[in-house]
């Protein structure tokens, strides 16, 4: 019939135009950069989700595995030992001193560093060598969940990472609810003996202490891991002393405090120990450490004079 053919041709042209535009859009999307801001505000660009990742701290390696990105890791630093698969990764030095040549040789498309643990001068050198560097700095318990989500985005494993982040937040909320109304316990958290070191206010462990209804007696200090004196501890007079050492074994030096009989923590035998791996690594396992910390502070409360 007259007029039908032009309409059909017009329809076909529209279909072809739509198909061409769609193909162009998809092609552009496929080559679009992924843009992120790291914890220092630095812009990080990736052409596609990272496939060759180097973690410059044990907790970063552990969190990458938790985020489903373990198979995308090509290197890490000394003491990266969890999960067991992390022990098999090539080493690129220690987190405080990395081997730039070893990193470059592994041809990573992403290096994830720790602001307060790694040397930021070396991080800048990695950027100068043309490598993409993402700086991480979790300071609060909630940051662990956010970190999992971000690692999932960086590695293209959000399906796993988002589930782990949700589980973390659920456990965190349960701990918060269980400890919200408990009386405060003045707490000294001892990282090491010589030099005598603790955690300052910005440190994630201070957040864990608050979560458990504790009050970090050195929480007013702005450093992450300040050195302090025995006299400062005596003056602060904590009700509980929580120490870490190496692994599960209670450090022998914890009972060095017994000589200071005036300390409330000593008088009530509130000298506790937690494995540093589950307390001082910014990973999902920090909730295991926090659970133990909360239990220790409950013991301290139970030993108060009636």
List each model region and its residues.
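Extracytoplasmic substrate-binding proteins
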Residues: 33-36, 42-43, 109-110, 114, ...
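Short helix-initiation/N-cap motifs at beta->coil->alpha
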Residues: 39-41, 92-101, 117, 221-230
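A short, structured surface patch at a secondary-structure boundary
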Residues: 51-106, 110-116, 217
């Amino acid at each position: 019939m007259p007029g039908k053919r032009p309409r059909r041709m017009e329809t076909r042209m529209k279909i072809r135009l739509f198909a061409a535009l769609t193909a162009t859009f998809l092609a552009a999307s496929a080559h679009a950069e992924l843009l992120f801001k790291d914890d220092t505000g630095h812009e990080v660009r990736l052409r596609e989700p990272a496939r060759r990742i180097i973690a410059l701290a044990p907790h970063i390696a552990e969190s990458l595995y938790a985020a489903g990105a373990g198979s995308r890791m090509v290197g890490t630093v000394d003491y990266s030992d969890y999960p067991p698969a992390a022990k098999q990764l090539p080493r690129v030095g220690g987190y405080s001193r990395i081997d730039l040549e070893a990193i470059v040789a592994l041809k990573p498309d992403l290096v994830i560093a720790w602001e307060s643990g790694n040397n930021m001068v070396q991080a800048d050198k990695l950027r100068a060598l043309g490598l993409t560097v993402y700086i991480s700095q979790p300071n609060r318990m909630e940051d662990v969940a956010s970190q999992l989500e971000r690692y999932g985005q960086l590695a293209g494993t959000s399906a796993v990472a988002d589930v782990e982040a949700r589980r973390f937040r659920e456990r965190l909320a349960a701990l918060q609810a269980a400890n919200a109304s408990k009386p405060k316990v003045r707490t000294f958290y001892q990282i090491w003996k010589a030099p005598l070191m603790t955690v300052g206010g910005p440190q994630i462990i201070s957040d864990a202490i608050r979560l458990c209804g504790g009050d970090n007696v050195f929480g007013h200090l702005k450093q992450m891991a300040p050195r302090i004196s025995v006299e400062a501890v005596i003056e602060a007079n904590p009700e509980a002393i929580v120490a870490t050492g190496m692994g599960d074994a209670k450090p022998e030096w914890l009972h060095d405090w017994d000589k200071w009989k005036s300390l409330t923590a000593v008088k009530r035998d509130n000298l506790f120990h937690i494995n540093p791996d589950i307390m001082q690594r910014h990973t999902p396992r920090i909730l295991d450490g926090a659970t133990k910390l909360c239990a220790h502070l409950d013991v301290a409360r139970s030993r108060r004079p009636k």
